[in-house]
Amino acid sequence: MANKKIRIRLKAYEHRTLDTAAAKIVETATRTGAQVAGPVPLPTERSFYTIIRATHKYKDSREQFEMRTHKRLIDIINPTQKTVDALMKLDLPSGVNVEIKL
């Protein structure tokens, strides 16, 4: 797998679990002899939801909720077969979405 690159995008609602998952991936990749670029923090996606508090009337009384999606990007440069095998067996915390591109 010479001159190849693995790009890993991580998404999570909690930034602490996202950072621990990114640290595990970086530590595993460096331990198996690959070069790592990242984790690079990507812009946080924010979603707002406005809901009427009362059931039938009092439309002026509303409540707003926000949902944030934190993202990180990790590039693994020149991965070996040992690196790929170690990443496949890696156990990441729940709540972290992982997208891998070769």
Curated annotation (Swiss-Prot):
Annotated source species: Streptococcus suis (strain 98HAH33)
GO molecular function: structural constituent of ribosome; tRNA binding
UniProt KW NAD keyword: no
Origin superkingdom: Bacteria
InterPro entries from the UniProt entry: Ribosomal_uS10 (IPR001848), Ribosomal_uS10_CS (IPR018268), Ribosomal_uS10_dom (IPR027486), Ribosomal_uS10_dom_sf (IPR036838)
Record's protein name: Small ribosomal subunit protein uS10
Physiological role: Involved in the binding of tRNA to the ribosomes.
GO BP of this protein: translation
